[in-house]
Amino acid sequence: MEIIFYHPTFNAAWWVNALEKALPHARVREWKVGDNNPADYALVWQPPVEMLAGRRLKAVFVLGAGVDAILSKLNAHPEMLDASIPLFRLEDTGMGLQMQEYAASQVLHWFRRFDDYQALKNQALWKPLPEYTREEFSVGIIGAGVLGAKVAESLQAWGFPLRCWSRSRKSWPGVESYVGREELRAFLNQTRVLINLLPNTAQTVGIINSELLDQLPDGAYVLNLARGVHVQEADLLAALDSGKLKGAMLDVFSQEPLPQESPLWRHPRVAMTPHIAAVTRPAEAIDYISRTITQLEKGEPVTGQVDRARGY
C-alpha cells in the first residue's frame, strides 16, 4: 500500500514515521513536485493540483475538519480529482473536545457577566451586577454536525436551554431541533447565545447578517467557531453598536490574519482568537486515518466521507 502526504506546514518526516508505525504494511512518502509514482491514498492540506490530478486513488483524506478550500479548488480544477474517488475529512480527532472547551468557557464567561465586570474594572468601579438566570440564557447552535453535537453535549451539564438549527431534524436528548429556513425565525427569537458551527457552502456564506441578527433577542451574543465568511462583519459591528448584540467572540474571520485596520480589533465588545478553537492533533488524526484506511481495505463501512454536492 502506497500513501502520499502533503501539508505546507506540518513536519512531514514525523507524519511519515507515525503513519508507517500505525500502518505497518504501508509505505508512506512526502509528495514533492515531480512525484508521479503510483499511490493508493493521499493525505493532504491545500494540495497543488498536480499532486492529485490523474491519480487512481482509493481515497483522499483532508487533514482538517473543514473541506471548503479543497472543494473550491476541485470546482475550479475538475481534472484534479475524479468524482468517483471518495474524499474524507477528519472526523473529530480531538477537535470535539477542543470545541467543547471553547464554547462552554465562553458561554459561562457571558453568563457570569465576566465581560461586564472587566469593563467595570477598566473604570475602577466596584459594582455587583444582577445575575442572569439559566432560563433566560438559551443557547442556539447553527450547524448540527459532529462538532455541533459535541458542543451541545458539553453545555447540557450546565443546565442551559439548548436548541439547534440544521438541514435535517435532530433527535439529540434535551435539545430542541429546528429545520430549514421556515423554522429559522422561531429558532432565533429565543436564542440568547448564537453559536455558529455551519459548514462553508454557497448557501451559508454571509448568513450571519443584519436580517438574521435582527431576529435575535436584544442583548444577544454571537460565538463564531466555523468560518469567517459566514459573518457580514459590518452588520455584526452595527448590531453591537446599536445594542442588539451585547458581545461577540470570534475565532475566524473573512480575511486571515485579520488586517490591522479592521475595526474588530478595537471594538470593546468583540473578543477574538486567531483561528485556534479546534486544531488538528496529529496523534488522534493518525489514529482516525489508519483506522479508516484499514476499514476501507477490508470493505467495511466507514464514516467521515464528504458529500461533494452538499459541500461537507
Curated annotation (Swiss-Prot):
Function, in words: Catalyzes the NADPH-dependent reduction of glyoxylate and hydroxypyruvate into glycolate and glycerate, respectively.
Keyword Nucleus: no
InterPro entries in UniProt: D-isomer_DH_NAD-bd, GhrA_Enterobacterales, NAD(P)-bd_dom_sf
Keywords: Cytoplasm, NAD, NADP, Oxidoreductase
CDD domains named in the record: GDH_like_2
Molecular-function annotations in GO: glyoxylate reductase (NADPH) activity; hydroxypyruvate reductase (NADH) activity; hydroxypyruvate reductase (NADPH) activity; NAD binding
NCBIfam families the UniProt entry points to: PRK15469.1 (NF012013)
Major place of residence: cytoplasm
Name recorded for this polypeptide: Glyoxylate/hydroxypyruvate reductase A
Reaction catalysed by this enzyme: glycolate + NADP(+) = glyoxylate + NADPH + H(+); (R)-glycerate + NAD(+) = 3-hydroxypyruvate + NADH + H(+); (R)-glycerate + NADP(+) = 3-hydroxypyruvate + NADPH + H(+)
One GO location term (cellular component): cytoplasm
Compartments reported by the entry: Cytoplasm
E.C. designation(s): 1.1.1.79, 1.1.1.81
Lineage: superkingdom: Bacteria
Recorded family membership: Belongs to the D-isomer specific 2-hydroxyacid dehydrogenase family. GhrA subfamily.
Top-level enzyme category: oxidoreductase
Active site, per annotation: 227, 275 (proton donor)
